[in-house]
Regions:
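Periplasmic OmpA-like peptidoglycan-binding domain that tethers envelope proteins to the cell wall
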Residues: 12-24, 36, 46-140
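Extended, gly/pro-poor, charged amphipathic helical "stalk/hinge" elements that serve as dimerization
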Residues: 1-10
Length: 140
């Protein structure tokens, strides 16, 4: 499961603090995460390439990591998601999905991604159960 959220859905402008309207979205996401209780959850923060001007945040690396951490803590503290399943990561401005040459491009790059994945042992089980691709013959 892959969820990408625009920064203005979750945070106050130029901040890593969760805004009031994020609750409904995070509540729904927490439900999905809870339904996949044996899966791991990675929250990644991403920014545009505009340098941050807040004195308490050094750069876009920090901002992206702080935003991801805020979401992880909200999922844990407010919605009861097991913290052992959660990871937070900041990608800064280095994982753009489009160029930063326009306001629209910058807006699209300012996002938080939530990725729900099976643990490695579960993934290997899924591979073992997967049918062979067409054209691949089983070797005996």
């Amino acid at each position: 499961v892959y969820i990408s959220l625009a920064d203005n859905m979750l945070y106050k402008s130029g901040s890593y603090e969760i805004n009031e309207r994020a609750g409904e979205t995070l509540s729904k996401i927490a439900k999905i995460i809870t339904d996949y209780k044996d899966y791991e959850v990675l929250v990644e923060g991403n920014t545009d390439n505009v340098p941050i001007s807040r004195t308490n945040i050094r750069n876009n690396w920090d901002l992206s990591a702080l935003r991801a951490s805020s979401v992880v803590q909200e999922l844990q503290n407010k919605y009861g998601v097991d913290p052992k399943r959660l990871s937070a990561a900041g990608r800064g401005e280095y994982n753009p999905i489009t160029d930063n040459d326009s306001e629209l491009g910058k807006q699209r790059n300012r996002r938080t991604q939530i990725i729900v994945t099976p643990r490695l042992d579960q993934f290997l089980e899924l591979i073992d159960k997967a049918p062979e691709a067409e054209g691949e013959a089983a070797t005996e």
